[in-house]
Amino acid sequence: MGNRGLSKAGIVLALVLGGLPLTVLGADAARQPDNRAHVDRAETAQAQTRAVAITEALFSYSSADLPAQRAEVADLITGDLVTQYAELLGQAEEGVRGQQVAFTSKVTHSGVRLLDPGKAEVLLFLTQSSTRPGEAPQSAGAQFVLTLVRGGSGWQQAKGSAIDLLGAR
């Protein structure tokens, strides 16, 4: 088998190995839903903007007016998230009873991890600052996923979704 045999074997091996990544990528892509998060910039931006607005409204409130906070977010959330948010706000109310404290949340980074024609999953990172009279502001970070669905008026929080705190409890 001289040099000529080695060259043919090398070419065949190169073709087989060169096609392997395409086969693996093709098989993986076949299992994935039609994710347009990195392709459809306009829809990605709309879903991301809506998720940021919902998140900042949910997590910015004052202890002086928690009933108003509940009313304000009533139109933003549905389904399981209504129950989960009521529990979170109830815990907050217990923790700040008799205190004057305001929480302001700002989404610092976000990204759409899934986008198809009817659904978007948005990963959000936020900083929440608390201010009390006579004290320096304090900050903490959080991250979670918010699922949105496409409705007649645009992107809205999905009925069956809750805030996925990514394992943080």
For the regions a language model picked out, list residue spans one by one.
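Core segments of small alpha/beta cavity-forming domains
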Residues: 42-98, 102
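Surface-exposed, charged secondary-structure patches
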Residues: 98-133
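Hydrophobic/aromatic beta-strand elements that line small-molecule binding cavities or substrate pockets
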Residues: 107-112, 142-148
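Structural motif
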Residues: 119-123, 139-145, 155
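Solvent-exposed, non-transmembrane alpha-helical starts
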Residues: 133-139
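Short beta-strand edge/turn micro-motifs at domain boundaries
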Residues: 143-169
